[in-house]
From Swiss-Prot:
Residues bearing PTM N6-acetyllysine: K52
GO-annotated molecular function: flavin adenine dinucleotide binding; monoamine oxidase activity; primary methylamine oxidase activity
Keywords: Acetylation, FAD, Flavoprotein, Membrane, Mitochondrion, Mitochondrion outer membrane, Oxidoreductase, Transmembrane, Transmembrane helix
Subunit structure comment from the entry: Monomer, homo- or heterodimer (containing two subunits of similar size). Each subunit contains a covalently bound flavin. Enzymatically active as monomer.
Similarity comment text for this entry: Belongs to the flavin monoamine oxidase family.
Chief place where the protein resides: mitochondrion
Cofactor: FAD
Organism: Bos taurus
GO cellular component: mitochondrial outer membrane; mitochondrion
Post-translational modification S-8alpha-FAD cysteine, affected residues: C397
Protein's name in the database: Amine oxidase [flavin-containing] B
Protein localization: Mitochondrion outer membrane
Amino acid sequence: MSSKCDVVVVGGGISGMAAAKLLHDSGLNVIVLEARDRVGGRTYTLRNQKVKYVDLGGSYVGPTQNHILRLSKELGLETYKVNEVERLIHHTKGKSYPFRGSFPSVWNPITYLDHNNLWRTMDDMGREIPSDAPWKAPLAEQWDLMTMKELLDKICWTESSKQLAILFVNLCVTAEIHEVSALWFLWYVKQCGGTTRIFSTSNGGQERKFVGGSGQVSERIMDLLGDRVKLERPVIHIDQTGENVLVETLNHELYEAKYVISAVPPVLGMKIHFNPPLPMMRNQLITRVPLGSVIKSIVYYKEPFWRNMDYCGSMIIEGEEAPVAYALDDTKPDGSYPAIIGFILAHKARKLARLTKEERLKKLCDLYAKVLGSQEALHPVHYEEKNWCEEQYSGGCYTSYFPPGIMTQYGRVLRQPVGRIYFAGTETATHWSGYMEGAVEAGERAAREILHAMGKIPEDEIWLPEPESVDVPAKPITTTFLQRHLPSVPGLLKLIGLTTIFSATALGFLAHKRGLLVRI
C-alpha cells in the first residue's frame, strides 16, 4: 500500500524544506523523505547546557543573500552580527600581525603588488564566467583543464601571496588547490560576489548568524508541514515507469507522486536505484563531484579574553603545522558562552581525524595561545566538534567540488530534469552556491519548475529576481584607482626593463649628438 501525494521531496535539508514549503503554500500535497533522524542536512544546531546552542554545520549569512534572509524572516528568525569590532590577526611564519579590513596588511611594496594582482586577476577572470552557465565562458575549456595550483603558479610571484591564495582556496571550498578546476573555483567565487565579498565578515559572507542557530530554518518549516515530513526514511528506489512516480524507502515504505525533487548532494544519487536508469551524463556526473573535507571545531572559554587584548577573534593562520587555517569569534550576541570557532580544512581534516578528540583540542588550544599570545587559550571550559566527512548522508562539507575537466563536460546536466525528477540542493544554485542562500534559491526554483510543469505558472516565473533584504542591505564592494591600475610584479619588472633600455638609448643618442662618444 503506497501513500499518495503530488510531490515527494528527497532530502530534508534547507533546499528540500524550502522547496516543500513553496509547494505546500501553493496548495500542493507534499511529502518530505529525510534519511536522518533530524531535518537540516548540512546545517545542524546542537543544543545542550554547556553551549546553549551551536551551529556545527552551515551557519553564516550576509548581505546579498536575500533568499535565505527573506525565508528566515518569514519563519520569525533574527540575525546578529559576528564580532569584528576589534582587530583581526594574520599569523604567518610564526608571527602574528594585527590588521583591520577584509585582507591582511602587506607592507613590502613588491609583495603588495603581488597580493593586489592576485585578487584583481581572480575577480577579472570571474567576470568572464556566466553565473548560470560557467561552461559558456570564452576560455571555459582552457580554464577547466587547469587546476587552481596551475593557475596560482602562473599568477603568484611571491611566496606570501601564494600561501594566502592556498589558504583562500582551502577555506572557500574545503579542498586542495590541486583537486579543483580553475574554471569551477573562479565561478564559485564570482557567484558569491567576488573575492572580497566571499572572504569578508563585515559586508561579506560571514557577517551574521541566526539567533538560536541555523537549524531552526528547517525545523520551523517542519513545524509548518507537520507529519508530511518523514524522518529516518532513506530513499533507495525511484521508479518512473508507471503513471505516477514510485519512491521506496529503506524500511520498504512506498510513496506515489506526480513529481519528485531530489534535494541531496549529487553524489548521494548513487545510493538510489533508478528505473529506468539515469541518462548517461547524469549517471556519470554523480560519480565525479565529491564533497570537501572539513571538521568544524568550537573551543569554549570562561571569558572572551581576546577582546580584552583588542582582538575580535578572527584569525587567518598560515602554516602546515597549524590545524586551523581560519577562526572566528563564536560568542553569543549577549556575550555569554565565549568561544572561538575554527575550521580544520581539506587535507588537515583528513590528517587530524586520526587523532582523538582530546588530542585535537590540545592542538587547537596550543595554536590559539601562540597566535593570540595568551596562556588563557590553554584553559578551555568545553569543546564541541563535527567531522562532516563521517556523514554518510552528506559525504562531506561544505559543498561538492568539480575536479579539472568536469564542469565543461557535465555541468549542463546539474539542473536538467530526468523525466519527472527535478533537482535542487545548493550545488545547483547560480548565486551563493555552497551556502544556505544557494540552497533556498535552488529549492524554490525546483519547486517552481514543477508548478510550471503542472501548468500553474508560466515559464518566465521559474526564475524570479529576489528583492534586496531591507534588514541586511549590501554595501558595494569598491576598489581604488591604484588597486585597479597598479602593475603586477612581472609587469613592474618589464616596465623597469623597458625604462632602462629607453633611458640607455636616450643617453647614448644624447652623447652621440654632443660628440661625447669616442670613435675607435
